[in-house]
Amino acid sequence: GHVRQRDGQIQMFGRDMSRARPHEVSRLGVAYVPEGRGVFPNLSVRENLVMAARRGRDGRDDWPLQRVLQTFPRLQERFDHLGAQLSGGEQQMLSIGRALMTHPALIILDEATEGLAPQVVAEIWRVIGEIRRDGIATLIVDRDYRRVLAQADQALVLQKGQVVLSGAANDVAANAA
């Protein structure tokens, strides 16, 4: 589910999104990679990816199926396997791939590397860098603040639900040390 905000405003593309429904947020180009993967267990890798495919809100088609499969070769190898048959790392690759198939303007990654093997973690962070280089805005929620700060332009640090640091990633990194 979604948590309702208590105060303030959420703006995207100059529009107040505070009361927007999930499908409205998605239509504006927001893709969400949830903590816990969120793949469809009874659908194949192919079906999970193809069902998400659509052009971006600006007509972009930067992440077609072939590019997702080149980015995550393991998904190509497991193309006809069900989501439930994949390892945790493969499921996370599938979840990110599915989000990219929507050609988002913004991708939200919630604990994208939690519980994954170190080599998969490195692969996910490599792909996050590629996503950013493509000009897709990323919002990363992760406990590994050093990796986040290495990727980020701006950072916000929460402690017990309160903002304790915010600003340019370099400034936040200097203050977090």
Residue ranges of each PLM-predicted region?
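H-loop/switch region of ABC-family ATPase nucleotide-binding domains
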Residues: 142-143
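ABC-type ATPase nucleotide-binding domains, specifically the catalytic core motifs of the NBD
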Residues: 20-22, 45-65, 71-76, 80, ...
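ABC ATPase C-loop
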Residues: 99-100
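Conserved catalytic motifs of ABC-family nucleotide-binding domains
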Residues: 103
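Catalytic Walker B motif of ABC-type/P-loop ATPase nucleotide-binding domains
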Residues: 107-111
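Conserved ABC ATPase signature
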Residues: 82-86, 90
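Conserved ABC transporter NBD signature motif
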Residues: 8-15, 28, 61-63, 167
